[in-house]
């Protein structure tokens, strides 16, 4: 008999969870203006809002924290981190930042000017926000297959080479760089193939452009290359990562995802001119170059986390849990972005709440219903997150409207996955009774989903 799969870790410490009543949750979400970001953590039973900074660290990471060097300049923990990053990516120049959006802010302050065009694959919210706040334009070049949530394609996060080439052929002089998000979060945590990274590199070289990877989940991307792309099944995760980054000129990183830490980020590049340009913005925005907004102990934990997560057993355990949840939804017939991604399951709200018009934000409505049902907090990745068009100020309804259920790393058991799936099934079973959604009563100009105020219709 073949032995079943089991996690690659055991539990040393636990945190109690609090259940609540349906009446409590109905009151709490109303007080939060129907914005799940405004809920207090003790009002949540299972938190699937994000996988960013919500994971559990290993005993090795905690041990490394005790050895953290808090020197303002020349911290030994920085050089330990730099050595690890260079070993995994091949990038020589490293600037730490307090998280991923800070890395974008520092690097884009150097590279993105008003009127610039930045093509890529479904820029995530902070990436798009940092581009558009500089009066520049993010152009989505994701493959069209990503728009069909029921289509089984192994690399739905890919850049469409024809779309990318068209942008460069027409407006190359306005393009400071190409950005590739690995994995493609907005499209459902979908991976980018190694072949596609080669194609992007070739197009970039043709037009003399550089390539940045938004690398928050680069280890998950490497795992999918190993399991889905021919020629990589016998490669280690570290070998695949090294090849992936060979097709890039630099990276921004939110270490709160695949770095397995609660806070941190960095910029890494092979180009001295990018490093020198970013330095000028790191010091006033983040801090000195050898800490950049991070404590020494956090840099030490990050170095260990990067090394741990680029081992097959660690990343496989993480992705197998997400696949377990997907299998439960398959059993219940609930539609989601297929195949399931690495960090989250993205429920197709347009296919679930078919009676709720897009103008009333089906994914946000589904997120509210799931919270009321069982205290499970998800996150809308759809029409609210898309913000308004910066020119017309109209809502952007052209993309997908998804409920993202992120799974924190090394935190929940499969019993929790069963609860999430059962709660979704309960909502799905009464989907035809849900005919109205929400309306916006207050919003900010950029990244409105964090603070938007809504009313239930």
Model-derived features with residue positions:
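Conserved PLP-enzyme active-site core in the AAT-like
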Residues: 2-34, 38-55, 61, 70-94, ...
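Conserved glycine-rich beta-strand-loop-beta hairpin in the small C-terminal domain of fold type I
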Residues: 322-323, 337-349
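PLP-dependent enzyme catalytic core of the Aspartate aminotransferase-like
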Residues: 309, 373, 385-457
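Short amphipathic alpha-helical segments
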Residues: 263, 343, 401-405
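Short, conserved charged micro-motifs
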Residues: 275-276, 354-362, 410-419
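Flexible glycine/proline-rich, aromatic-decorated loop/lid segments
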Residues: 137-140, 269, 274-277, 297, ...
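Short glycine/threonine-rich loop-to-helix capping motif typified by GTGT followed
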Residues: 192, 346-361, 390-396, 448-455
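Phosphate/diphosphate-binding loops
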Residues: 256-258, 362-369, 373-374
